[in-house]
Structures are given as structure tokens and as C-alpha cells.
């Protein structure tokens, strides 16, 4: 594994000649002449005065604070001086309203300084959370290796966390763990690719692509909100369409899915993988998105065959991560509903699926940022309900919402699935029915069917959602929340 130096990070990622150091000469604690000699040798070997470099810079023209670990200085270990430097950098970034790009590379706490150095993890974490509480973006790029106290503080608190390919990332380095416990971890457990698959980090990106990723993220997170969109009235929407025809239309394999929506309508999309705490489920997509004039957090279901797309408890916890992220970054939320239903397995029941649905609905219904839910296709039961609460809801002309798939409702009422079409009609599942009952604010036309005009339809659906958000972002928060509450309270 080739280790990435501080110089390589600065020269590859930052705009040329824009880095300005914030560092002052470190004040080192007195742990005797042996430690002083170690520090002197580390400085001589690395040409650095501590294990971290901080400063201000531009990335793609965006002003940022930069914090980069230096493994060449005592294995990037964090003592009192390095921890103070990190803390001061976060505090300055917060005071100046700057996003932070941090790139840890560290063996952990500096053992020469013992417990006092270990306890500095607390103040670093406090400074990071104060920065996040100010609504400022925090991007993390983990380099090989990142372990111990660095990973367990500033390395794990980013809004977006990605890592170098093949990087060793873990709480305890493999050599120390094997000495302590007598056996190693299985091969690959502490590698960045494994952590991405498990939902601990958001992805794996080589250094040469980090600048592009950072610029995209900064564009989403710092660009002004000037949404543009298009409104559609109900005139021309067929009211005599059989509900079962809409069900069949949404199950057409050629019908656009979430990834088509993003491809045709998003200017930037940065996926966020998993919960960040070790769970990952691909049935829910969460990401930072830039639509024309509007940045948002998008949370959506990407319709696939039932066996691949049923909603699990972990998927709902992934969605909840998106809610929290939107609130912290003060970004609107757009949800996309298109699901065959919840996971119906022993694992889902034991995993608390019903409780996660309740918590997801409650969280989305009360989140303080503007929310628009979009019904792209199938709205099957509680899987749809989980992403439905919103200030405004737009629905594709063939979109629908039902407490169960019509076949399931038919099985309950008629003890056969053969009456599914009758149940679809009886349950008032169509977009026009949802509009009439107040569950939908606008129907987006399909001309004549989304499967026949995927690009145009996707752009219309997002134009409708962003037009709704243009009105919502202009409203005072408390007024908007009151209207949202009253909307569902008064629904008949």
C-alpha cells in the first residue's frame, strides 16, 4: 500500500497556491528528555513540527478549512499539541463559517503522552459537533492507515466519509490486536472496501478523484437555493382510468425508476452508503443532490422485483440518517416512493420492522426542513407510508398508494387474489383519488405513459417537486410546520 503524504493531498486536491497555514509552533508537554529527543528526530525526518497540518484553501473556488494528518511524524499519533491544533482548526472554521475537509492518517493516541493525550479525543469531538451544529459541512477522507483515537473521534464524525482504496481503517491496528488477543482479524475486515460494503463509510475513492468528489459535495452543500420548476394542473388528467390499469403501468419493467430520475434530472448526485454505523441496505437510496437551482437530501426507493426491493428495518434506519443529515445541514428533503412493499421475513420481524416504520413516519412527519414526497410508481403499504409524510406531495399520473398490494387486499376480503382489480377500485388508490382526499397536491402527467417518455417524464416530476419546494423554502418554519400538521390532522 502506497501511503499518501500531506504534500500529495495538498497538491492534488486543493486549488494551486491557495493553501495558507493556520499552524503556530506547537507547545509540547514535558515528558522528559527522551520524548523531547523523539520529537526532534521526528521533525528532522519529516520536516514537520507535528502530526497534523491545518489551514485554509480553495477547492474548485470554494473556500474551505483543511486538516491533514502526517504519518511521517511519529506515525501520525495524536498528543496534546496535535489535538490542540485540530481543535483550533475546527473552532476557526466554525467562527469563519467554513466547510472542513479533513484527511486523517494516524496510528492513534500518542502512547508517549499516555492518558492525557487519550482524553483530548473529547475536546476534538466537541469541536467537530459544534461545527456541525452550526450547519457547516464536514467531509472526511480516510488515508492508510487510520486507527485508534483518530478514527474514534474526528475520523468518524463527517457528514460524508470516504476512504483511500485498500486503506487500513480500524479501531485497533492488526499487529497490536494480535498481540493482545492472540489471533488476527479475518483478512480484509479493516479495509476500506469492507467498511463501505457494511455501511460504515460512504465509499472508496482514489486520491486523484477526491478533488472532483469534494467539488461536487461543496456545490451541493454551499450553492444558493434558487429553485426553478413547473406547476401542473389537473386539467387533462384522465379521471376515468381504471385503477388496475395504473397498477399494471407502474409494474412495467420499462417504467423509469429512481436511478433514471437521477440520471435525467439531477445535476449532481453523491450517494451516501448505509447508516454510517455498520448497516447497509440497497433498497433505500440516500444522497446529496443538486437539481436545477436546488440542493437537497434525497431519500428514495428504487423499484426492483419484490425479492430484491422489499423494505427492511436496516433500510429504514438508512432513511433516518438522511432525515438527520437534512436537518443538520438545513437542506430540504425530497423522498421518492416506488416499492413493492415491506420485507416479510422472520429477520424483519425480529429486527423490529414495525417499530422502525413507526419511528420513520414520526421522524419524517416532524422534521423541521421543507419536505416534498414524490410518488413515482408503486405505493405499497407501510413501505410507501414510511416516506410519504411531507409538506407537499406530487404524484405521477399512474402513481398509487394502497394499504396492501391489491392482490393482498383481495386475499383478505375475498380469500383469493383474483379480485385484485376490484380492490384497487374500492380502495381509491389512484392519483386522482389521492388528490381529491388531500393526500396529493399535484399530479404530474404521463404523456401517455412514463415508460414511453422516460427522460421527459423524469424532468417533469422533478420540476414539479422543485416548484413546490420554491414555495416551501420561502415560508417561515413554524408556519410551514403548522400547515403540515393541519394537513394530515384534517384529512378525511
Regions found by a protein language model. Name each.
Residues 1-59, 63, 211-296, 300-308, ...:
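Intrinsically disordered, low-complexity segments enriched in small/flexible residues
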Residues 50-53, 282-285, 319-320, 357-358, ...:
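Glycine-rich, charged/polar anion/phosphate-binding loops
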Residues 57-70, 85-110, 289-303, 316-344:
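A structural preference for short, pocket-lining loop segments at secondary-structure junctions
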Residues 71, 79-86, 120:
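Conserved mixed alpha/beta catalytic, RNA-binding, or beta-rich assembly cores of soluble enzyme
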Residues 74-81, 113-116, 306-314, 346-354:
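Flexible beta-alpha connector loops of hexameric P-loop NTPases
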Residues 106-227, 337-466, 470, 474:
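Conserved catalytic cores of soluble enzyme domains
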Residues 129, 303-333, 351, 357-369, ...:
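A structural preference for long, well-packed, hydrophobic secondary-structure segments
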